[in-house]
């Protein structure tokens, strides 16, 4: 269950299947990083699966709703919410937290550079679920780029159109 005010925060109701798909892969006691967490649509089901989640969000209103949603779903004890810019906070995570077992990165449009930043926080053999916005003809090049960066592409799929010819894509990656 989620509460939110769509006048103040972003929420995509069309990604319900995708959020369930990823949450089902999470094992109890995993350490999961979720930057750009919003009101908690990935955080809450992952925490409910027994994972320990570090969530990062810069929007104060989204943080308020994420906290409320964690309480509403009784998973607040499994979540560390950090209010701040995910790109700034990333440098500090190496100091405070050991490497993560998994990262779920619902990347904002045009911010693909964050994959390199957050993949360094995931342990070798760890999973990364990376979301990006691309045209279909760009996908083969991305797969090659990810694999050259030491990220094995286990799975990828389109998660729906966002503009003419542009889709949101998810890549399930394993850090080598």
PLM region spans:
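Rossmann-like S-adenosyl-L-methionine
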Residues: 1-176
């Amino acid at each position: 269950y989620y509460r939110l005010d769509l006048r103040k925060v972003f929420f995509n109701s069309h990604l319900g299947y995708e959020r369930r798909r990823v949450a089902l892969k999470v094992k109890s006691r995993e350490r999961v990083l979720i930057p750009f967490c919003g009101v908690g649509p990935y955080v809450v089901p992952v925490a409910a699966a027994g994972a320990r989640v570090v969530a990062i969000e810069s929007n104060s209103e989204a943080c308020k709703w994420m906290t409320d949603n964690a309480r509403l779903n009784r998973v607040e004890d499994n979540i560390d919410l950090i209010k701040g810019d995910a790109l700034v906070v990333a440098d500090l995570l190496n100091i405070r937290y050991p490497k993560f077992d998994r990262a779920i990165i619902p990347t904002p449009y045009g911010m693909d550079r964050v994959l390199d930043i957050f993949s360094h926080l995931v342990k070798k053999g760890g999973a990364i679920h990376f979301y990006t916005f691309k045209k279909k003809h760009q996908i083969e090049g991305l797969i090659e780029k990810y694999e050259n960066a030491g990220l094995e592409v286990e799975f990828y799929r389109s998660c729906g159109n966002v503009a003419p010819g542009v889709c949101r894509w998810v890549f399930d990656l394993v850090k080598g």
